[in-house]
Amino acid sequence: MSSTAGRGLDARRDAAWLSMAEISAVGLALIGQVLLTSALAETTYGRWILLLDVFIAAFLVLDLGLPTLLARDGPTHPSALRPAVWRVWRIQATVAVPVALIVGAAVLSRHPDVPALVLIAALVSLLHLATYAPRAALRAAGEARLEAWSKVVERSVMTGGYALFMMQGEADVLPYALVLAAGAAAGWLCSAGLLHRTLGPDQVEPS
């Protein structure tokens, strides 16, 4: 990373960006849930949320505190941010993929009629897990505003997709589940892309 990549840390500025993003993201999430509950039958909605909660709970500790360490140590070692993100991803994948397979098999044994929903719920949780590291790195690089935008992009894709399907009268849960996965993917790609742009092209991906 070049010495000019990123910006200096400013707690007040970063807190303002993150606060605005959180308020926007929570607002969009609430709108999304209202749309979802309006579009789906109560039992269908309940089962989808249950599947999501199972994987979210299983992955809750799988960030292993690594993004937190990245956000803490990154400002003092900015040239190590990109290699650190790749290391975090490799470590998380090593732990998360086996857990996803085990939890997925257990959930499928209880809900064998919805394999697609189980797969999507696992994918959404994995994508959210993968987003933590680049967002922490953006904050460490002094770009909390870009971290904030990545969150808003994720929620905007989700809420916009929900609204589109609701206006079309869609009552099946699968399209809404795919929209949630698309939002999670957008958040991950956006945060990773913004980090790459912030750090510049002069770092080489570690082998």
Specify the residue positions occupied by each region the protein language model found.
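Helix-loop junctions and terminal segments of transmembrane helices
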Residues: 62-78
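Membrane-interface junctions at transmembrane-helix termini in multi-pass inner-membrane proteins
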Residues: 73, 127-150
